[in-house]
Regions:
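Extracellular adhesion/carbohydrate-binding repeat motifs centered on closely spaced tryptophans
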Residues: 2-195
Length: 195
């Protein structure tokens, strides 16, 4: 009887150890499965981002790059996205990264705010202040060539969008552009050294 009881006790301990090991293995495999479902996944042509097995919705920042996933469906946004405020954002069509700074899309240049990603219009100065470009309020594209406002003031922008300042030759003629505002002068101009 003592031997049977001892065998039962050993069997119970063995069974307990096996169940503990199985439980640990199950828990480890669950953690592994969750880790495996962290990242971008494409399902039926739609891209999602999962964190620990759950869909992420709204803004996502990875490696200092911003993405936006639809707040209802979790689908990664790509291409142009219009804002109710007017300006638009653009998310790379391949990987969904939000554009910032000056970017070329469909053969045209746009400027996207560094923080918000919204398209900017009007005069935009480079970070070092040396270059000024103009982006059209009607479609946010970069201006090239002559630009005239309602007051009759004129500016000129090179093919790379840089606003002319100082004395410049355009075609056969020389023009003088205010070094601060870029506005083309008319009539005689005293530049300090010569007229």
């Amino acid at each position: 009887m003592g031997k049977v009881c001892k065998k039962s006790w050993i069997a119970a301990i063995f069974l307990g150890v096996m169940l503990f090991a199985a439980g640990f293995a199950f828990q480890a495999s669950t953690v592994d499965a969750q880790a495996a479902t962290t990242g971008f996944r494409t399902v039926k042509g739609k891209t999602y981002y999962y964190k620990n097995g759950k869909k992420v919705k709204g803004w996502l920042t990875l490696n200092r790059k911003k993405y936006f996933l639809n707040t209802r469906t979790g689908v990664l946004l790509k291409g142009w996205q219009r804002s109710s405020r007017g300006p638009k954002r653009y998310f790379n069509k391949k990987n969904g990264v939000m554009y910032t700074g000056m970017k070329k899309i469909g053969g045209k240049y746009y400027y996207f705010d560094i923080k918000t990603g919204y398209t900017k219009s009007g005069f935009v100065r480079s970070a070092n202040g040396a270059v000024v470009r103009y982006f059209q309020p009607s479609n946010y594209t970069m201006a090239k060539g002559w630009l005239k406002n309602a007051k009759g003031q004129k500016w000129y922008f090179a093919s790379d969008g840089k606003m002319y300042m100082g004395l410049k030759k355009i075609g056969k003629y020389y023009y003088y552009f205010n070094p601060s505002t870029g506005i083309a002068a008319s009539g005689y101009v005293n530049t300090g050294n010569e007229t």
